[in-house]
Amino acid sequence: MVNVVDLRKTYRTSHGLDTIRVDFSGQGPALSYRPKSVNAVDGISLSISPGEVLGLVGESGCGKSTLGRVVLRLLRASAGSVEFDGVPILHQPEKALRHFRRSAQIVFQNADSSLNPRLSVGEAIERPLALFNLVPTADRRRRMEALLDMVRLPRSYQTRYPHQLSGGEKQRVAIARALATEPKFIVCDEPVSALDVSVQAVIVNLMADLRDEFNLAYLFISHDLAVVAQISDRIAVMYKGGLCEIGVTAEILRRPRHPYTEALLSSLSVVDSENESRSGRLRLFGSIEAEDEQISGCRYQARCPYKVGAICETVTPPLRQISQGHSAACHLESVPANGVAPSYANPPRS
């Protein structure tokens, strides 16, 4: 249903102190700007089948939300292609995207900013029905109440406003609004990260039930691997704009094949013995934002305890198939599997 090939989104900046070059030689201008490029999405390819949940996990700043927005054409791609039901959408005129806009929706992280404070719950849910002329005016209220039932909110809530709702209730309204157009595919962009842990589980279970009932496909984005594992059929791990690993959820959790995935698993509060790393638990040092701009080689080399030498610094590892439906982008998959212990070629950074 959704097919993404070599998708890229590059941001170019030409202002700011980090892009200023000072020339003291007197041969050129004293100050000049050096444009800087940031590859938020860097050559990603993936597919999502009808009724499938693909979880996309990674730290803040890795580009996962940007990927979701580019797939929905809320942001313009720099290169690559996205097909929905076999139809390319990236270069279609907006008028030709009406079917796509109805069939593909998004649930944002912060319902406070995605819900209009001036619209009641009922008005917010009815608005897509009017925009797409999905049901006669006389039937809109009945349809809106049915949507409230789907997300397990009392019908009396239709007269309430966002400020009168809890965080979980607001997110239920956002889900109901997304369901109003009867979509096939929903991008769930950190839909539970702003909620209490107890509420997170309830919302994730609700979304899983809706998937089963309506055969929905989700791109479920989160920084929390435990949340992603709860609902996903497959998991894709993203780092600095690219995919590190992708595979069936059970396989990713049981036998991760990329050091970054291992580190994410090790960061969970409860780790099964089968999920231990190659040589015990891995700690994740540093942050994406703290790293220098990468020129070549593996995008994870600055933090990887398994760094094997020059190949990691000079050659970008391809996403290599390890087993049926399981791929990882790591040079360790091409060296003898004799139990490589962490070398800490990069000293751990706090």
Q: Model regions: which residues?
A:
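Conserved ABC ATPase "signature" region
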Residues: 22-29, 88, 139-156, 265-266
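ABC ATPase NBD coupling module
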Residues: 31-35, 89-105, 131, 137-138, ...
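Conserved ABC transporter NBD signature motif
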Residues: 80-88
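A short, proline-enriched helix->beta-strand linker immediately N-terminal to the Walker B motif
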Residues: 180-184
